[in-house]
């Protein structure tokens, strides 16, 4: 293992160890992976931004899109590091300019996301960033918004992946390359 690979492995372990697991939250049987504990640790937070930025440094991405709300915390610094614009995708009524919206299914009901109509240009190569990949529903809705504006979603990046919930497989089937810093078993 090279020094660089060894450093990366150490950083990934440090990041994973900084994420607290809360049992039975928000309901019994769920193991909640709390990324806010990573944010409280500047060394782990910095390492996560560094690793994501390095991973996409040669990707040709022209925009980074972050989903509300924790996607902003990782997407905006990655966009700065890559020297590209950051675009927020938000809940309805939170963006001041003209928007388009996309509804998507939740376990119990539906939710909606919005994006400014002038934030993505036709041909933009987009990296979508969020804190956690579970079923992929939120990211799928985000991808639909970007594609409706003419953007090409080439990558999706996450701090945490919960592979058992199928989100990565769902997005991969749509031609989206997924990258996660760490994975956890269970829900």
Swiss-Prot record:
Quaternary assembly: Homodimer.
InterPro entries for the chain: Ade_phspho_trans, Adenine_PRTase, PRibTrfase_dom, PRTase-like
One Pfam family named in its UniProt record: Pribosyltran
Enzyme Commission number, as recorded: 2.4.2.7
Top-level division of the source organism's lineage: Bacteria
Keywords of this entry: Cytoplasm, Glycosyltransferase, Purine salvage, Transferase
GO annotation (BP), single: purine ribonucleoside salvage
Localisation per UniProt entry: Cytoplasm
GO molecular function, one term: adenine phosphoribosyltransferase activity
CDD domains for the chain: PRTases_typeI (cd06223)
Similarity annotation: Belongs to the purine/pyrimidine phosphoribosyltransferase family.
Main location: cytoplasm
Cystine pairs: none
SUPFAM superfamilies registered for this protein in UniProt: PRTase-like
Known role: Catalyzes a salvage reaction resulting in the formation of AMP, that is energically less costly than de novo synthesis.
GO cellular component, one term: cytosol
Catalytic activity: AMP + diphosphate = 5-phospho-alpha-D-ribose 1-diphosphate + adenine
Name of the protein this chain belongs to: Adenine phosphoribosyltransferase
Pathway participation: Purine metabolism; AMP biosynthesis via salvage pathway; AMP from adenine: step 1/1
Organism per entry: Yersinia pseudotuberculosis serotype I (strain IP32953)
Enzyme class: transferase
PANTHER family: ADENINE PHOSPHORIBOSYLTRANSFERASE, PHOSPHORIBOSYLTRANSFERASE DOMAIN-CONTAINING PROTEIN
